[in-house]
Regions:
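Short, highly charged C-terminal tails/helix-capping segments
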Residues: 278-280
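Helix-to-catalytic-loop junction in kinase catalytic cores
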Residues: 265-266
Length: 440
C-alpha cells in the first residue's frame, strides 16, 4: 500500500514537473521574442506538452484534450491540432485481443483483410474486414486494459487538481470540476453500445436528407462483444482529395457541413461534437436523378460518434435563439431564455433581483454583440466565460459540447469556404424559407 502511494506521488510529481518546465520554457522564449519583435505562438507550447505527455502515457493527451475543450482555453486551431494528434497513435501488438478477433470470425463470419490495424487511436484499433456477403466493413476494437489505464490516469490527475486549488490563477479554472464533468464524456468513448445507439439515432433523424450517409452498424456483434464495433465501410474522398478542387465545389461541401450541424442542433436534437476533417468523407455523384432526386450531386459521409449529445426540446429552442435570433438576426429580445438554458446554476440566476439580473444580461449582450458579427469563434466563449465567472456561473455540460462542436466544425468549414459567415447565413435563410425548422 505504501509503495503504491509512493509510486503515485512520484508519477504526479513527474507530471507536474513536465508541464511546469514546458510553461517556463515557453514564457521565457516569449519574453525574449517580445524584445526582438518576433511572434510567439501558443500552439508551440501545446505541441511540446502533448509530445511530452505522450511519452509518459498517451491517455494523458486525451484527458488534456478534453479539459481544454471544456473550458475553452484553446483557439480553434489549437483544438483541431489536439484532435488530429490523437487520430493515429503508435500501438503495441500486446494491445490487440487476437482471441476476440477469432471469435468474431467464428461467430459472425467477419474476416479481417489484414490483422494489422489501418488506424490506431488512444482508445481503440481499426481494421479493414469483410462480412459473410463480402461487403466491406470496418472493425473497431478497444485496446486491452484501456479502461484501467484511463482510471489510473484519471485518479492521478484528480490528485493534481486538488493541489491546483492552492495555486493562484490556476485555482480559478476549477480543474477538479472540469475533470469530473469530463469523466463521463471520456468513458462514453469506450462504450461501443452508446456509439451504436448514436449512429442509429443520427441515421433515423437524417433519413430524409439523402445528402448524408452514415454507416450501418452490426448491433448484434457489439451486444455480444462489448469491446467490438463493426460497421459498414463508407469510405469516400478525403479532404486531401478535394483540397485543390474548384472553390465552387468546396463551397457546396461547406454548405452541407454547416447544414448538417445546424439541422442537428436546431431541428433533430442531435449534435456531433467531433466534426473535423478526419471524420468526414466527401462524395461527388455525376449521375444524379433529377426526376426523383434520390441521390444528390454532393454528399457527406459522417463517422466516429464517440462524442455526441442530444439536447431536449427546451434547450433546442434556446439554441435556436442563439443561432437564428442572435447570430443571424442580431435580435436580443429573448436573451434571458438563452442564458437560463446554458447556466448550470439556474436557481441562483432565478434568485437574482431585477437590477442584478439585468446587469448580467446587459454584460452578456455586450459580449455577444462584440463576438457574433462574423462566425462564432473561441473569443466569444472566452469573453462570455469571464462574464459568467464574475457571477460565479458555469456553462452547462451540454452547452460546452455544443461549443466544442461549433469550434471544430467552424475550423473545418474555413478550410472549405472562403466566407464561412455567408455560408452559415445561407443555410439558416434556406431552412427558414422552407419551414424546415420546428418553432417550439
Amino acid at each position: 500500500m505504501i509503495l503504491d502511494v509512493m509510486f503515485i506521488v512520484m508519477r504526479i510529481t513527474n507530471l507536474l514537473l513536465i508541464v511546469s518546465y514546458e510553461f517556463v520554457k515557453f514564457y521565457c522564449k516569449k519574453s525574449i521574442n517580445y524584445f526582438c519583435n518576433i511572434p510567439t505562438y501558443r500552439l508551440e507550447l501545446i505541441k511540446n506538452i502533448s509530445k511530452k505527455l505522450e511519452q509518459e502515457n498517451i491517455v494523458y493527451v486525451k484527458i488534456f484534450q478534453a479539459l481544454c475543450f471544456d473550458k475553452d482555453l484553446l483557439s480553434s486551431e489549437e483544438q483541431c491540432y489536439l484532435l488530429k494528434y490523437t487520430d493515429n497513435v503508435p500501438y503495441d501488438t500486446s494491445e490487440i485481443d487476437y482471441d476476440l478477433l477469432d471469435k468474431l470470425e467464428h461467430d459472425f463470419s467477419i474476416t479481417l483483410t489484414n490483422r494489422t490495424p489501418i488506424n490506431c487511436g488512444i482508445v481503440g484499433l481499426v481494421f479493414d474486414g469483410l462480412d459473410s456477403s463480402n461487403n466491406k466493413v470496418i472493425v473497431k476494437m478497444l485496446k486491452k486494459d484501456i479502461l484501467q489505464k484511463f482510471t489510473d490516469v484519471f485518479d492521478e490527475l484528480l490528485y493534481i487538481s486538488y493541489i491546483c486549488k492552492y495555486i493562484p490563477y490556476i485555482k480559478s479554472l476549477k480543474i477538479t470540476k472540469m475533470l469530473l464533468d469530463n469523466e463521463e464524456i471520456l468513458l462514453n468513448q469506450m462504450d461501443f453500445i452508446k456509439e451504436v445507439e448514436a449512429i442509429e439515432i443520427f441515421t433515423k433523424k437524417y433519413k430524409n436528407n439523402k445528402e448524408y450517409k452514415f454507416p450501418r452498424v452490426y448491433r448484434e456483434i457489439t451486444e455480444k462483444y462489448g469491446n467490438l464495433l463493426v460497421m459498414e465501410n463508407i469510405t469516400g474522398l478525403q479532404f486531401k482529395d478535394i483540397e485543390l478542387l474548384d472553390e465552387t465545389v468546396k463551397e457546396e461541401f461547406a454548405y452541407l457541413l454547416n447544414k448538417f450541424a445546424i439541422l442537428g442542433t436546431l431541428f433533430h436534437s442531435v449534435i456531433h461534437c467531433d466534426l473535423h476533417s478526419g471524420n468526414v468523407f466527401f462524395y461527388i455523384n455525376n449521375e444524379t436523378n433529377s426526376i426523383n432526386n434520390e441521390v444528390s450531386k454532393y454528399g457527406l459521409g459522417i463517422i466516429d460518434f464517440g462524442i455526441c449529445c442530444f439536447p431536449n426540446k427546451k434547450n433546442q429552442n434556446a439554441y435556436y435563439i442563439f443561432f437564428n435570433d442572435i447570430h443571424y438576426k442580431q435580435d436580443y429580445s429573448n436573451i434571458e431564455e438563452l442564458l437560463y438554458a446554458i447556466i448550470e446554476e439556474k436557481e441562483v440566476f432565478s434568485s437574482f433581483n431585477i437590477i442584478k439580473k439585468q446587469q448580467f444580461i446587459n454584460e452578456s449582450i455586450d459580449c455577444l454583440i462584440l463576438n457574433t458579427k462574423d462566425e462564432i469563434t473561441t473569443q466569444l466563449l472566452i469573453d462570455l466565460s469571464k462574464v459568467f465567472n464574475k457571477y460565479d456561473f458555469n456553462f452547462t455540460e451540454e452547452f460546452n459540447k455544443l461549443i466544442l462542436s461549433i469550434h471544430v466544425a467552424n475550423h473545418f468549414g474555413k478550410q472549405l469556404s472562403i466566407n464561412l459567415k455567408a455560408t452559415q447565413t445561407r443555410v439558416l435563410a434556406d431552412l427558414n424559407k422552407f419551414n424546415e425548422l420546428v418553432f417550439i
